[in-house]
């Protein structure tokens, strides 16, 4: 509707003024608007004293330009180190790094709506669980699929996760035998895709066994995150771009993954039709089968089924892969921590898969996971919300209705006022001696409040399965060769490094193992 209205307005102006005049008026209008806004923001706004980059006062170009570097998470941490708890990052956009701000902005009751920033993460006509801005509509969508994410449902997927974790171990052993240097974060993404494939559509994507990006899923997601991260700063252009891409031979990044999801849905529909009843679906334990049964009851539509399946595969794979890559990096570059974790694992389970329930009773394993996610939270940008009618007071400053506010996880988790002077150090023990603030902040790696990641327990299930199997069986030489640890942020902050898998040195003394 917005696209059609915009096109109609342009056509009307062009007919009255002609293209030559129109092309002169548009840039003049843009410059005049930004100049007037700068004057207001600098001299009259109640928020004029909040520090931040000069260009951020008048335009989102500053934030867009910094995002394009792939390093926005580091830039945000530096801004807070220099300016304190509140920084300006755009016209009417402010970022925070405190627990007080987190509790207010991501409150559960009377939740703040998401900003237009999220529009490019979905389709304009069919908002999904992630990009839906209205809290009430989001709640309705969430209610439709909540039963798929309960603890009972989670435990029912455990056997499928065990099967893929066994393949992970086999493939790592093959790399070990071949003394092969691998892109470990990429291979862990293959694992995450294969697991989420089994859980979501009842079938592995076969990435680990082929050691390849089947269906182009990994590259498709990379392209989508790049696109959405930049388009988020001009969100109203998203619908225009989708319309243009449908008219021109423009490659849509997510096409391969979308086609894979569509094929699996068609296969399941045909399977159900062949049997003529629900027996074929009831015998399957995965998201898609359950969604198709919900379709038959009228609780979800075919479009909602496709959205839920696509979102589960897309968001679930990157979240888990990045977390696993980070955990292993910090474990294998901190021998003392690795040794302590191995001692705990040996006390609980001598061999075979570790159950999810067993993993939850291992305090040091859970502390390792939390600490890695603290130092390297998955999302590197602000989780933006809009101040509601009546305004809000945050950190002693009043913010009027319509202001965009949010907390950057990287800035929060590296804040020494919260996590101490060793905030930049990997020290899992902090979670075993944690205070209330740290415990509350600990969950922010998966968002907070009513909009926290609905699939976070699936990700934790995968981590709790994969990490013990790897740690008990292998040593890993990180940064083998000349490729060092890098992090690039396009919404998600993706770790990049090479590694060599080696047999675990089981017979070393404690002192030798700490070298």
Curated annotation (Swiss-Prot):
Identify which top EC class this enzyme belongs to: oxidoreductase
- Top-rank lineage group of the source organism: Eukaryota
The coenzyme or cofactor needed here is: heme
Keywords for the protein's UniProt record, in alphabetical order: Heme, Iron, Metal-binding, Monooxygenase, Oxidoreductase
Query: Among its keywords, does the record have NAD?
Result: no
User: Which InterPro entries does the entry mention?
Assistant: Cyt_P450 (IPR001128), Cyt_P450_CS (IPR017972), Cyt_P450_E_grp-I (IPR002401), Cyt_P450_sf (IPR036396), Cytochrome_P450_monoxygenase (IPR050121)
Q: Which CDD domains match?
A: CYP57A1-like (cd11060)
Q: Report residues binding heme.
A: 453
| Similarity remark | Belongs to the cytochrome P450 family.
Q: What job does this protein perform?
A: Can detoxify the phytoalexin pisatin from garden pea. Pisatin is an antimicrobial compound produced by pea in response to infection by plant pathogens.
What is the name listed in the Swiss-Prot or TrEMBL entry for this protein?
A: Pisatin demethylase
Q: Which organism is it from?
A: Fusarium vanettenii (Neocosmospora pisi)
């Amino acid at each position: 509707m917005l696209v059609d209205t915009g096109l109609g307005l342009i056509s009307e102006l062009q007919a009255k003024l002609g293209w030559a005049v129109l092309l002169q008026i548009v840039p003049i209008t843009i410059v005049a608007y930004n100049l007037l806004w700068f004057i207001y923001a600098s001299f009259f706004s109640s928020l004029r004293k909040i520090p931040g980059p000069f260009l951020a006062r008048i335009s989102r170009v500053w934030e867009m330009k910094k995002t394009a570097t792939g390093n926005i998470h580091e830039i945000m941490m530096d801004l807070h180190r220099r300016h304190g708890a509140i920084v300006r990052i755009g016209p009417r956009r402010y970022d925070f790094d405190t627990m007080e701000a987190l509790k207010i902005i991501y409150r559960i009751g009377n939740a703040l709506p998401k900003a237009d920033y999220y529009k490019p993460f979905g389709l304009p006509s069919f908002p999904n669980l992630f990009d839906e801005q209205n809290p009430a509509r989001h709640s309705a969508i969430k209610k439709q699929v909540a039963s798929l994410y309960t603890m009972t449902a989670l435990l029912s997927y455990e056997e499928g996760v065990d099967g893929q974790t066994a393949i992970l171990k086999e493939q790592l052993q093959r790399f070990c035998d071949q003394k092969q240097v691998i892109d470990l974060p990429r291979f862990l993404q293959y694992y995450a895709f294969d697991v989420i494939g089994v859980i979501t559509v009842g079938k592995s994507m076969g990435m680990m066994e082929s050691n390849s990006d089947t269906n182009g899923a990994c590259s498709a997601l990379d392209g989508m995150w790049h696109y959405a991260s930049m388009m988020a700063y001009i969100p109203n252009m998203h619908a225009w771009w989708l319309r243009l891409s449908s008219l021109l031979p423009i490659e849509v990044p997510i096409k391969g993954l979308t086609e894979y999801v569509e094929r699996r849905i068609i296969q399941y529909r045909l399977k159900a039709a062949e049997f003529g009843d629900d027996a074929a679906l009831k015998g399957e334990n995965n998201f898609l089968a359950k969604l198709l049964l919900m379709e038959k009851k009228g609780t979800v539509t075919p479009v909602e089924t496709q959205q839920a399946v696509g979102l589960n595969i897309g968001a679930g794979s990157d979240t888990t892969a990045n977390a696993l890559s980070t955990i292993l990096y910090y474990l294998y570059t901190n021998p003392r921590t690795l040794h302590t974790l191995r001692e705990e694992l040996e006390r609980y389970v001598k061999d075979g898969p570790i159950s999810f329930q067993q993993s939850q009773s291992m305090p040091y394993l859970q502390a390792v996971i939390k600490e890695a996610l603290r130092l390297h939270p998955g999302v590197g940008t602000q989780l933006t919300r809009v101040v509601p009618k009546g305004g809000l007071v945050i950190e002693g400053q009043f913010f009027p209705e319509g202001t965009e506010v949010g907390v950057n996880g990287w800035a929060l988790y590296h804040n020494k006022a919260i996590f101490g002077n060793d905030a930049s150090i990997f020290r899992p023990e902090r979670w075993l001696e944690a205070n209330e603030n740290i415990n509350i902040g600990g969950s922010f790696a998966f968002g907070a409040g009513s909009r926290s990641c609905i699939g976070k327990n699936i990700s934790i299930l995968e981590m709790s399965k994969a990490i013990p199997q790897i740690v008990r069986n292998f040593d890993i030489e990180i940064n083998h060769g000349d490729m060092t640890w890098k992090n690039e942020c396009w919404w998600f902050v993706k770790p990049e490094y090479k590694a060599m898998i080696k047999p675990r040195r089981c017979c070393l003394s404690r002192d030798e193992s700490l070298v």
